[in-house]
């Protein structure tokens, strides 16, 4: 397991510029989508898979350059500037970065987003 003790300190630093609104995104599957998808799956005897990603944002690369100043927790490096390379919690663009990363992963294993709700992923059966 990786050491994420310093993650919160970087988020709390807040040394960054404003994030454009076009780079923010919060991915939420609609309640109606879940109900309809589960009903269709049940009626057609289809397999349903779901999952949760621990530390999900830190798995996604950060697509922009965000600088922070390191705190006392970093010892001799305190006060030095650093570039954040992962989509940490607290960054406005983290939701969009994670959604793009998840979309790339889902497409790479054969899933496609539903046209009605792009947070529902479907794999065509042949």
Predicted regions mapped to residue ranges:
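Long, low-complexity, charge-biased intrinsically disordered regions
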Residues: 1-126
């Amino acid at each position: 397991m990786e050491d994420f003790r310093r993650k919160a300190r970087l988020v709390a630093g807040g040394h960054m510029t404003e994030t454009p609104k076009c780079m923010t995104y919060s991915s939420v599957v609609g309640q109606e989508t879940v109900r309809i998808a589960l009903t269709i799956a049940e009626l057609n005897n289809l397999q349903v898979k779901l999952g949760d990603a621990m530390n999900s944002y830190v798995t996604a690369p950060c697509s922009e350059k965000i600088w922070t100043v390191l705190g006392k927790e970093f010892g001799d490096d305190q006060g030095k500037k650093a570039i954040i390379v992962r989509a940490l919690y607290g960054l406005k663009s983290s939701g969009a970065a994670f959604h793009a990363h998840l979309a790339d992963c889902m497409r790479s294993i054969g899933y496609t987003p539903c046209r009605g709700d792009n947070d529902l992923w479907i794999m065509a059966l042949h």
